[in-house]
Amino acid sequence: MAVAGFVFCWPLLGLTIVLLVAPIDAAQRHTASDNPSTYNIGGVLSNSDSEEHFSTTIKHLNFDQQYVPRKVTYYDKTIRMDKNPIKTVFNVCDKLIENRVYAVVVSHEQTSGDLSPAAVSYTSGFYSIPVIGISSRDAAFSDKNIHVSFLRTVPPYYHQADVWLEMLSHFAYTKVIIIHSSDTDGRAILGRFQTTSQTYYDDVDVRATVELIVEFEPKLESFTEHLIDMKTAQSRVYLMYASTEDAQVIFRDAGEYNMTGEGHVWIVTEQALFSNNTPDGVLGLQLEHAHSDKGHIRDSVYVLASAIKEMISNETIAEAPKDCGDSAVNWESGKRLFQYLKSRNITGETGQVAFDDNGDRIYAGYDVINIREQQKKHVVGKFSYDSMRAKMRMRINDSEIIWPGKQRRKPEGIMIPTHLKLLTIEEKPFVYVRRMGDDEFRCEPDERPCPLFNNSDATANEFCCRGYCIDLLIELSKRINFTYDLALSPDGQFGHYILRNSTGAMTLRKEWTGLIGELVNERADMIVAPLTINPERAEYIEFSKPFKYQGITILEKKPSRSSTLVSFLQPFSNTLWILVMVSVHVVALVLYLLDRFSPFGRFKLSHSDSNEEKALNLSSAVWFAWGVLLNSGIGEGTPRSFSARVLGMVWAGFAMIIVASYTANLAAFLVLERPKTKLSGINDARLRNTMENLTCATVKGSSVDMYFRRQVELSNMYRTMEANNYATAEQAIQDVKKGKLMAFIWDSSRLEYEASKDCELVTAGELFGRSGYGIGLQKGSPWTDAVTLAILEFHESGFMEKLDKQWIFHGHVQQNCELFEKTPNTLGLKNMAGVFILVGVGIAGGVGLIIIEVIYKKHQVKKQKRLDIARHAADKWRGTIEKRKTIRASLAMQRQYNVGLNSTHAPGTISLAVDKRRYPRLGQRLGPERAWPGDAADVLRIRRPYELGKPGQSPKVIATNQPGMPMPMLGKTRPQQSVLPPRYSPGYTSDVSHLVV
């Protein structure tokens, strides 16, 4: 069903297509049928031959079906060109416009002037009738505001500027002087050259610049004033546009100034080529088919027929105007026909025929003419259309050219000046700058005067320069024979480009500063300085071959050996020291606890009557732990228990390892060589990682700065370091020495010099961004090749190596640095001062502690004296009390005795009670319960309670130290004051048994 439906739709689709196409085809047939079938082509020609050829060409055209549609016929209407432009205007109106001409072909004699063709163009253009010129080459006809409908099959004179550019590129001339008249054509050719050169040199390597523009008034009488300016210029290539008459004057005066001979190059336009005094060797241009009116007539007719044919097929053509008196006529078809004409591109008898927006012929061919002896013109090249590449191509046979002075060898095109303006910049060690003293009038023999460039302050210009580049300059000037004036950079910078608005312009343009800016603006001839060769600079200036190859590297300060007061603590980190200190006291505490609580911690020798040894106290444990750690002798206070002794052995092993490690590491820190760098190079992660606390920088606007901008992989790093960049390299190097900047990225030559001069600085990593230092010159400078060859000779002869050793590496200084690095380090007071200070602190601590102990002891003695006085007073008081008690007791006992004696015993005998208690020996301490009252020293005083008298006498009561003890009363003798024997009397007895009287 689907297939059947699809087949059913085919007739309907076919009917739809027929209905849609039929109106279009009908409209086309209607348009073609509405267009005129006959077309009159007017001709304003200069002679009868041209008129006849014009008529014949149109007749032949009617039989050419390629250009003429069916039922279309062309007719010619011609008039003779009149020298009177007014009469020409009337003839155009009466004989051409009245006959409804659709276009007009115009030619005239080259010597008759362009007023008549202009009159035809004005008249026809007023009615929008296209005009095709075949001989008018003035620039005025390119102005479409005046000649609104004018085309031409010949190019204007100022189009020769395009050929000039091709010739300059072929001969590799980079500087030219343009000579032109001040009329419209002269200024047009200058404008064409300047405009075209801006886009032309994008595709070629050699760029030509205009050094001098000489403009003169037509109808010259003398050209000598301009020749004086031209003679002082550097360029010797002259591009001249002048009429034949003016060219004669210019060549005459130039010959008198010897400016048409050897070394000079003249390239002129067609008019000047026909001067009767054109010098030998002049190169000129001549338009191909320039005088072939018949060829141009045929090409113009066929171009017109081609445009009308296309217009007929696309739109309706209204009839041409018929009455010159009708000023209201506005022929739109004529305007449209003019646009069709400009779009034509055909191959005709005069070559490839095409037009630009102004209606001027493009792709016109030229012959390159070389003037020989006796004004003979010899074709040495062609500028023609290349159909394969669809563009114009220059072909010149250099071997056939005879140059001015009858030379076969191409001139250099420039005058090489022998006195140059040189610029330099202060950059150690390449250029040292010294201000002259007030009493100095000249520089040293190895120095050269170098005032500030373009500085009017006389006092600020007194500088002398020396160094690597100055020695190179002195030798270079001798080798290639030039003199110079040396000056310092006006702003102290190498130069970088900035984008700046031009006055009255909407676009930004690059502008160079510093040394490069002076060279680009041609205020200096050469830069002799450590100028890095890079693509940005090479686009605007010339460079010699490098006189020193180098790259980019990193400067940093060497890691210092920390010779501080606590340098002896460096082998261990702070954390490790803290752990060791904690371990000492923890082990001491554990030793004390193990020895305290161990059941086997206290022991005594077998069969020994001595008391058991005491356990290890905390103080002794700390002393033991420190003694083992510091490897000092342990005389007392060692652990007693087995468990504590095991821990002590382990602690001794720990102490041995710690002390050995400390000793070895201390030697490594204080004696062995330190690491040279912190960074491994540009690829170090710390440089790439923007989060690291590491500052790096370069000099802003320098070649290194440009390098980082170009490198995409370094963009993150550049954004970080951009804010830290310095104005000069000197400032950055000083900050590296002070430790304010960790890494300075700069040219390796300068940094190697700084590292060789200061042993504390070192370059890190390998070179990157390799380039070289070159001598800068102006674009197209004649000195470029000579300077390059001289530098290559210097490399071969070893002169550059000599400069490296003398100025950069500082041989003796570098050897001293290497000796310093290789010699083992000797420890001095600076390294070990902390240890001595530690001993001093120990001594001071000991003295301080003994002072504290003395003060404390004095305080204790005073306190003890007060206690002794109080105790003595208490003892005396206690003795008095005891004495009274004893007397009372004695009296009471005597009374009892007297009573008992009278009642029981016989007189003359007494029975004394015996104290059976054990008394301590002399000097033995007793407990408080055994102390005798009044004995301050707690030493037992034993006295005899009774002293027996002689036989027949009654015994005397001496004393009693025991309250309540019965005292014998001997008779009625009254007790007298007791007489106490001295303490520790040898008459002491420890036992009293019986006393018998």
Swiss-Prot record:
Signal peptide extent: 1-26
CDD domains registered for this protein in UniProt: PBP1_iGluR_NMDA_NR1, PBP2_iGluR_NMDA_Nr1
Keywords assigned by UniProt, alphabetized: Calcium, Cell membrane, Disulfide bond, Glycoprotein, Ion channel, Ion transport, Ligand-gated ion channel, Magnesium, Membrane, Phosphoprotein, Postsynaptic cell membrane, Receptor, Signal, Synapse, Transmembrane, Transmembrane helix, Transport
Compartment(s) where it occurs, according to its Swiss-Prot or TrEMBL record: Cell membrane; Postsynaptic cell membrane; Postsynaptic density
GO biological process: behavioral response to ethanol; calcium ion homeostasis; chemical synaptic transmission; ionotropic glutamate receptor signaling pathway; long-term memory; medium-term memory; olfactory learning; phototaxis
Biased composition (Polar residues): 987-997
Pfam hit, one: Lig_chan
Regions that span the bilayer: 574-594, 652-672, 832-852
Gene Ontology cellular-component annotations: NMDA selective glutamate receptor complex; postsynaptic density; postsynaptic membrane
Topology of this chain in the membrane: Multi-pass membrane protein
Top-level taxon in the UniProt lineage: Eukaryota
Glycosylation sites: N258, N314, N345, N397, N454, N481, N501, N693
Chain coiled-coil ranges: none
Extracellular side: 27-573, 673-831
UniProt region (Disordered), positions on chain: 970-997
Molecular functions (GO terms): glutamate-gated receptor activity; NMDA glutamate receptor activity
Family: Belongs to the glutamate-gated ion channel (TC 1.A.10.1) family.
PANTHER family assigned to the protein according to its UniProt record, in alphabetical order: IONOTROPIC GLUTAMATE RECEPTOR
Self-association state and partner proteins as the record states: Forms a heteromeric NMDA channel with Nmdar2.
Function (record text): NMDA receptor subtype of glutamate-gated ion channels with high calcium permeability and voltage-dependent sensitivity to magnesium. Mediated by glycine. This protein plays a key role in synaptic plasticity, synaptogenesis, excitotoxicity, memory acquisition and learning. It mediates neuronal functions in glutamate neurotransmission. Is involved in the cell surface targeting of NMDA receptors. Plays a role in associative learning and in long-term memory consolidation.
Protein name, per record: Glutamate [NMDA] receptor subunit 1
